[in-house]
Amino acid sequence: STLVGMELLIEIEKSDDIPCLLKTIKLCGIKVANITINDAPQGASKGHLEVRLSLLVGRNFDASHLLDELAFHMPVVKFEEL
């Protein structure tokens, strides 16, 4: 199956949630090609983090499935496909 690149921007409330975020992504069978963490995103609440992910996903991947999984484990402030 062909993998395609996908860019996601996820805003989370605290850095403690990063291990959970990455674990959940891995459990969904998604490969992370690159991750950038911005600890002072513009327009975000104090202490929030912006995590930009370059992912390799299957062609029929539905990002809303990942959002549902993440939201089950942690507060997701923003979830955006770039």
Predicted regions located by residue number:
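Arginine residue identity/basic-tract feature
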Residues: 23-26, 31, 52, 59, ...
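Conserved short beta-strand edge segments in small beta-sheet-based binding/regulatory domains
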Residues: 31-38, 67, 72-82
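Short, hydrophobic beta-strand segments
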Residues: 8, 47-55
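Helix N-cap motif at beta-to-alpha junctions
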Residues: 14-15, 56-61
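Canonical alpha-helical transmembrane segment with a positive-inside/aromatic-interface signature
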Residues: 1-37, 41
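Generic structural motif recognizing short loop/turn segments at the entrances and edges of beta-strands
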Residues: 4-6, 47, 75
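Short amphipathic alpha-helices in soluble, non-transmembrane regions
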Residues: 20-28, 62-74
